[in-house]
């Protein structure tokens, strides 16, 4: 059964109104009907330029005094204000107004209020007036509070308000009220990681998921201690001098706007519209991005390790996190930090590459390259050179492949290999591979009992020998087919390297 209390609690969310905007259809200056435009300008009490009595336009109608055309931007702001719906986005400030009223004819004592915000993972206290409780709460008396908190967790959030008071009979009573609201993600973030040797490229795509427009003030990547990051997005490739000139122009335009005055005529219309339109210019910063509803923007970050040879930077899964700051069209600031962005490491035990390839290679003259082998595991590896002969064409191995020593954990060895070019032109160094052998096992001499030695050895018949031979041939064929379809896990092939092979003699003799 619901209990009637002497106090009444009301909670209202404080939010700014929403100004509906109209997206205009922009067109070229030459396509504008000047007579129709001049009529519409008079009806809206704003003129873009001087129009003579015949309806024709002069040269200053859409062109400023300095000869530069004036850009027409359709703001489309209407004069009606509509209250914003109960939508709140992650990173915004949640603000609410709480009113506690005594609607009974009795006086209550020791009134205090506790407010907390509950999420799926935490409870955040917002208000606790127990230490400053109201001694007497007369009939008709009310007490108002304003609480605010940055929303840092999406999903269902619950505002819990607990009221405690003492009745005239001395009985202590309390009641609670719960207010649920949904926190939505303002941005849809999609990331893609391109993992290359000694460098990682992070591609981030931001999409505006709100019901209005957003101004992305900044998006920064905060790497972990083992990495450095650099923003290499397209807009950040401008010269510093150009950015400095743009900033100076923006400051100059802002100063001019602050000094402007609106001059009204007898009818209440603006007289100095030409001066206003000449000085009012949309100034944007290279770092600020305007995103309409449903629009997206891509960013690119270059992440490099501070120490290339550091094992922790090579094996580190997390790279860092993104810090995004934006503003709504009312200037309300929002901030969002993502969780740690992780990459997928190449789980291969060994890394093979060819280095120190000569710049000039002569036809039918041997040359040497360096095979670099890196043990990326925590155990000792036993590698062996292998050749994929069906891939080798223009350049082949000149001699026998050397025998490799065991590679210690997290270490690198380099081996010199002699190659021999057979064909001129653009050729590929390909077909060299590494096979990891099983670690050597210490041999154990088997012991046989006397009973086993005394048993006679049965000789197989001719039919059994033929049957075993056929079965072994079938098994060998199946193994060869499986090896052709998919190489074993302990087989690592070097990446192909393109190189140019020149003729040995500078002069070619026609035959």
Swiss-Prot record:
InterPro entries: TRAPPC13, TRAPPC13_C, TRAPPC13_M, TRAPPC13_N
CC per GO annotation: TRAPPIII protein complex
The organism's place on the tree of life at top rank: Eukaryota
Family from the record: Belongs to the TRAPPC13 family.
PANTHER family: TRAFFICKING PROTEIN PARTICLE COMPLEX SUBUNIT 13
Protein name: Trafficking protein particle complex subunit 13 homolog
Organism the protein comes from: Dictyostelium discoideum
């Amino acid at each position: 059964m619901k209990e009637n209390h002497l106090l009444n609690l009301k909670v209202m969310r404080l939010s700014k109104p929403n100004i509906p905007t109209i997206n205009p259809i922009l067109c070229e200056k030459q396509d504008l009907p000047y007579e129709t435009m001049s009529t519409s300008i008079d009806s809206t009490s704003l003129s873009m330029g001087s129009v003579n009595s015949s309806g024709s336009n002069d040269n200053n109608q859409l062109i400023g005094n300095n000869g530069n055309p004036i850009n027409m931007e359709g703001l489309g702001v209407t004069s009606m204000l509509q209250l914003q719906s109960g939508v709140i986005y992650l990173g915004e400030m949640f603000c609410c107004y709480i009113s506690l009223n005594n609607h009974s004819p009795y006086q209550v004592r020791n009134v205090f209020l506790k407010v907390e915000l509950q999420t799926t993972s935490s409870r955040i206290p917002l208000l606790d007036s127990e230490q400053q409780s109201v001694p007497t709460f007369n009939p008709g008396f009310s007490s108002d509070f304003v609480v605010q908190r940055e929303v840092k967790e999406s999903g269902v959030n619950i505002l819990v308000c607990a009221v405690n008071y003492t009745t005239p009979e001395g009985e202590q009573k309390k009641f609670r009220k719960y207010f649920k609201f949904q926190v939505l993600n303002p941005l849809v973030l999609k990331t893609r990681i391109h993992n290359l040797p000694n460098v990682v490229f992070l591609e981030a795509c931001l999409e505006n998921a709100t019901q209005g427009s957003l101004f992305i003030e900044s998006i920064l990547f905060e790497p972990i201690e083992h990495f450095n990051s650099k923003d290499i997005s397209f807009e950040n490739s401008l010269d510093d001098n150009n950015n400095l000139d743009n900033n100076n122009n923006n400051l100059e335009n802002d100063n001019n706007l602050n000094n402007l005055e609106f001059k009204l005529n007898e009818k209440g219309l603006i007289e100095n519209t030409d001066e206003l339109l000449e000085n009012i210019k949309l100034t944007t910063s290279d770092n600020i991005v305007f995103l309409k509803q449903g629009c997206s923007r891509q960013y690119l970050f270059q992440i490099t390790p501070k120490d290339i040879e550091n094992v922790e930077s090579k094996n580190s899964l997390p790279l860092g996190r993104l810090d995004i700051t934006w503003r709504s069209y009312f200037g309300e600031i929002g901030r969002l930090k993502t969780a740690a962005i992780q990459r997928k490491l190449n789980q291969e035990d060994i890394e093979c590459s060819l280095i120190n390839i000569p710049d000039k290679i002569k036809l039918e003259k041997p040359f040497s390259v360096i095979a670099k082998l890196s043990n990326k595991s925590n155990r000792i590896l036993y590698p062996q050179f292998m050749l994929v002969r069906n891939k080798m064409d223009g350049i082949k191995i000149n001699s026998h492949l050397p025998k490799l020593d065991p590679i210690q954990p997290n270490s690198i060895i380099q081996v010199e290999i002699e190659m021999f070019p057979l064909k001129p032109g653009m050729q590929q160094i390909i077909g060299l591979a590494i096979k990891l052998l099983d670690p050597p096992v210490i041999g154990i001499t088997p012991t046989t009992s006397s009973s086993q030695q005394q048993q006679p050895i049965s000789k197989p018949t001719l039919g059994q020998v033929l049957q075993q031979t056929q079965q072994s041939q079938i098994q060998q064929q199946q193994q060869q087919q499986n090896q052709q379809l998919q190489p074993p896990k302990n087989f690592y092939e070097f990446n192909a390297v393109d190189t140019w092979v020149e003729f040995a003699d500078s002069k070619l003799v026609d035959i």
